[in-house]
Amino acid sequence: MDRHITAPITKETAKTLHAGDYVYIAGTIYTARDAAHKRMQETLQRGEALPLEMKENVIYYMGPSPAREGRPIGSAGPTTASRMDKYAPELLDLGLGAMIGKGKRSQEVKDAIVRNGSVYFAAVGGAGALLSKCILSSEVIAYDDLGTEAIRKLQVKDFPVIVVIDSEGNNLYETAILDYKRES
């Protein structure tokens, strides 16, 4: 089923999404990769405020290439999500609405998604140039010293993703394998 949603993503919206749904996101999302996640964890350990509010926001695991003239961003393909698994449960517990990446997630992340009524989306790896066409603007908002891994605020329109883990814990990567085996 194709869905069009607007970020930030509320728990109510997350509940309507199901593993396997094709979703087009409009609105504001943020980027963060390994180094930014590590720095956010260190910030929380010091008892300081994060550079962005987690509640209902979307983090896209992506570090863009340089923008061509006239474009807000360069190639913007997803990063392997499992690299953020040690940080994700804490951010989900702070209210993170959704994550976008590629690949499988740990059981701890899946449990945190269910516990918090969140969702994990996958974007197509290798399609970064095409995905960048859905990004209307890009602004570094934190950790500028991290270069491509700085946290960016993106405005997106019709950004294509697939629900991999929904708020009930259904996991497309697991169900698709079972469906394939039944068909074989």
Give each language-model segment a name.
Residues 17-18, 73:
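Short, polar loop/linker segments at the starts of domains and inter-domain junctions
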Residues 88, 164-184:
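Active-site/ligand-binding-proximal alpha/beta "capping" segment
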